[in-house]
Every structure is written in C-alpha cells, then in structure tokens.
C-alpha cells in the first residue's frame, strides 16, 4: 500500500514562545543564562532535548546576537528548526559546499545566504 501526499497541507511550525517565561524560571536554566550573561562562561553543556529552550532563554536575555556552534551541518539544521519554534529571527550560516583545496566555487545562493547571515550579525 502506498502513501498519500497532501500537497495542500503546508507544514506548520508549532510556536512554543509562550512556554519560554516558565522555562526561564527553572533554577538550572537561570544558572546557565546568568553565567553567560555575566560573561563567566560561553560554554553550555546540556542534554540534546533541553538545548533549544535553553538557548532561546539565553538569546532572549542577551544584549548581542547569540552564535551557536554545532558539530555538523545536519546538527545545525536540526537546531535551527527547533530554535525557530522558540524565538523569532533564527538564522543558519550555511556551510561551504566545497573543500578549500578544490577549484570549485560554492553555489551563488549559498554565498548569498552566508552574506545575509553575516550582515545580520554586524547590523
């Protein structure tokens, strides 16, 4: 039996922004946000499931843009999608599609997306 596609249904994002004030009052979340806000530590180690709301809490209290590093492009995409449910304005800096020693240039749209994200960080 095959699967049925529903082209008329768009994938809708569930917004969790209403939960953020309650999550932000958790003592562990407060400790992490206070630590990063005071400049004591820029490293947060947390289980995968709590990372999006934790980072959203840190980002909402930060006076500057929050930059998060991930191990892989796939991790970055997953985290970007999850964070977008918690806070607006999430962007991902796409990876170059070529290796430094290759004579190929990245796609124009990749370069444009990278420039757009870098511009947002500066302005």
Residue ranges of predicted features:
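ASCE RecA-like P-loop NTPase motor cores
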Residues: 1-123
């Amino acid at each position: 039996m095959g699967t049925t596609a529903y082209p008329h249904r768009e994938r809708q994002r569930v917004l969790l922004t209403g939960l953020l004030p309650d999550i932000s009052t958790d003592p562990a979340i407060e400790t992490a946000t206070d630590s990063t806000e005071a400049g004591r530590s820029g490293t947060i180690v947390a289980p995968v499931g709590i990372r999006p709301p934790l980072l959203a809490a840190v980002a909402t209290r930060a006076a500057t843009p929050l930059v998060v590093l991930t191990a892989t492009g796939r991790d970055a995409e997953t985290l970007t999608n999850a964070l977008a449910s918690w806070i607006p304005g999430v962007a991902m800096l796409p990876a170059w599609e070529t290796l430094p020693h290759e004579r190929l240039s990245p796609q124009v749209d990749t370069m444009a997306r990278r420039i757009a994200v870098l511009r947002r960080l500066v302005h």
